[in-house]
């Protein structure tokens, strides 16, 4: 028989924070249905939220969470046409060179060949950066590694910020690609030099449960529904709030995105224009690409986050 080891003190159990408890509550479970009764719904229940004191009106179609000062939710603020344009650009252009993605970052780190150029997002694509590219190793924004921010993205951010009376210079952006079962753990966006500057976040595709807490994970977060066309703006102290996405709900994408026939400029089968220029202009290049996008959006979510770096 082997030598018996001396008994050791049991390892300390990791602390379960209030934020972690909320994440566990909303993440998919197989046996018990998820209770969404506490999720704040500002698309259909804004008036009730105002009456209950959960939010206050902060501008045309904008609401500030009462217990999360500086966080504004703008439900349904992005029009369907603008959603279509953004969705197609995220799907077909923003992950292509010279964009930085999790795949190009891994290839550079490991010294392997860069990923092949593809029309649709690869299945293992998780994020892509625009404008000033983010260095994930050093947690800094490169001054010498930047591309012009797409004009329609910058203009959208200007319009959204104007609704709550703030301004920003859109310098850097990240597109997050959520597929069924994907989540985003609680985190703080703290790489920017000046975190008093606004951060704009736009949701496209399937609905999500969004959690926003406080300056530590010990603060119990508020759960908010985010649907396609909703925007959030983080300002002031809200830039230091922990936030995350514990749940994406497949098959909740609105018809104006998921149905090819809902696209007003859907091309004929002879179009065949798959150029970057067509994607960047927001024009569906051809029937095949449009079908691919609609199929992707039926079960997925796109999240565009834009910020001013401030240095």
Language-model-detected regions and their locations in the chain:
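Non-heme Fe(II) oxygenase metal-center motifs and adjacent flexible, charged/small-residue loops
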Residues: 1-311
């Amino acid at each position: 028989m082997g030598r018996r080891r001396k008994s050791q003190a049991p390892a300390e159990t990791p602390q379960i924070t209030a934020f972690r408890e909320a994440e566990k509550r909303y993440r998919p479970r197989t046996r018990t249905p998820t209770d969404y009764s506490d999720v704040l719904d500002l698309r259909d229940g804004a008036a009730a939220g105002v009456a209950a004191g959960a939010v206050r009106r902060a501008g045309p179609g904008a609401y500030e969470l009462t217990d999360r000062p500086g966080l504004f939710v703008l439900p349904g603020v992005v029009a369907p046409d603008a959603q279509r344009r953004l969705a197609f650009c995220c799907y077909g252009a923003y992950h292509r060179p010279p964009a930085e993605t999790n795949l190009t970052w891994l290839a550079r780190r490991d010294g392997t060949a860069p990923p092949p150029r593809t029309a649709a997002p690869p299945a293992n694509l998780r994020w892509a950066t625009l404008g000033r590219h983010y260095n994930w190793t050093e947690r800094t924004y490169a001054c010498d590694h930047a591309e012009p921010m797409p004009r329609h993205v910058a203009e959208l951010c200007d319009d959204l910020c104007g609704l709550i009376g703030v301004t920003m210079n859109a310098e850097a952006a990240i597109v997050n690609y959520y597929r069924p079962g994907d989540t985003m753990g609680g985190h703080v966006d703290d790489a920017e030099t000046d975190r008093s500057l606004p951060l704009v976040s736009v949701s496209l595709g399937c609905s999500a449960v969004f959690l926003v807490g406080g300056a530590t994970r010990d603060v119990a977060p508020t759960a908010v529904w985010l649907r396609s066309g909703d925007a959030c703006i983080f300002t002031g102290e809200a830039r230091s709030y922990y936030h995350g996405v514990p749940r994406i709900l497949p098959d909740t994408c609105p018809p104006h995105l998921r149905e090819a026939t809902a696209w007003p400029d859907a091309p004929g089968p002879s179009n065949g224009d798959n150029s970057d220029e067509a994607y960047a202009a927001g024009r569906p290049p051809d029937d095949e690409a449009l079908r691919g996008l609609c199929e992707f959006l039926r079960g997925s979510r796109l999240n565009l986050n834009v910020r001013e770096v401030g240095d």
